[in-house]
Amino acid sequence: MFYNLNGGSELKRAAVFFANGFEEVEALTVVDYLRRADIHVDMISTIDNKICRGAHGIDVAMDKLIDEISDDYDAYIFPGGSDNAASMRQNKKLLDKIKKVFNEDKLICAICASPTVLYEAGILAGKKITSYPGVFKNIEGGFDYLEEKVVVDGNLITSRGPALTVYFALEIIQALEGEEKRQQIENQILLAMM
């Protein structure tokens, strides 16, 4: 169990999933901002290696392998990167986990190409989503595609790409910790200056 040393209450927990080819900005900005918001974040490798290489050649050490985790996270987060998403779409263990935790009303978040992973897991039917432009061009999946920065539909948060990662992370913070914590992080990162 993880406790917030600043307030004593139990910390929310988030798992961010990686494979080789992950989009560094989308992955590490989310990890950074959630940790600033006192959310416990584990970086999870979906490959058989605790080092994952980003789309732009940055190697990042993971906290755990997918086989080492349980289903007790409050949020499950999937950064983009076309190779990252392609690898995750082929990972049956991951797809089964996504379906299970989604049906338990856990928060599921994907940005850029990774909403296609959620599609492959079979959880997008009837949902409002967004993604990087064009990744769903040959897919008719029964979801409502919106060209917005971030789309929230129940326990599902999706976003479009690297420049919008700030807003994606803030929506996750708001969903887990509320509007006040989101405002605190917005002030800390000088969002009003953008």
Regions inferred by a protein language model and the residue ranges of each:
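A cross-family phosphate/adenosyl-ligand binding-site feature
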Residues: 54-62
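Mobile, glycine-enriched helix-loop/loop "lid" segments at the mouths of ligand-binding/catalytic clefts
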Residues: 50-52
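Short, solvent-exposed amphipathic alpha-helices that sit
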Residues: 26-36
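Short, Lys/Arg-enriched N-terminal segments with co-localized hydrophobic residues
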Residues: 1-11
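Short glycine/proline-centered loop/turn elements that form peptide/ligand docking sites
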Residues: 28, 45-48
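Active-site-adjacent pocket-lining segments in enzyme domains
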Residues: 13-16, 22, 35-45, 62-64, ...
